[in-house]
């Protein structure tokens, strides 16, 4: 027989709420109606939720890495992001318009959704809690440098900061600057450097850690 014992005071127990929130009740009501009217099945809803929960920033990182190594692709990406993403066999999501915006040495772009949490989930996965917070949504527009500073990013005074407000009809993907020291890296290795936050614009992509010279350290 399996046992599941707890030592006294081992950890704080999880306390479930007895009542659903307003939005949870509304979600369940809509889901029940969709199933009842035969528009969707419970399994189709479950599979869609599972698919959304499984999305990660990996696809977005692939797009960025390709743009870094292929100038022609980057030009197409900046011109028509949805079409360029489709070239890689990737899904850019349900939003009618996806816009790629490039960070440079003189221009730094930041994305926010001032109304809710609109976000290119198909490429970046679920939005982080801070992206959905009122603090970020309200301050990113009026004090972007201050917000970036809180993420540890201090920009030079001569760098222009542009803030893009995402919406249900238009999502944005930041193409961060390629960091120095990556000239000999493969496309797959470059993708491994790209983070979710850099594709939102609140951080830069860091240069890879220097690798030790094994030949130099080997005994003669």
Where are the language model's segments positioned?
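Terminal, compositionally biased segments used for targeting/anchoring and flexible tails
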Residues: 2-220
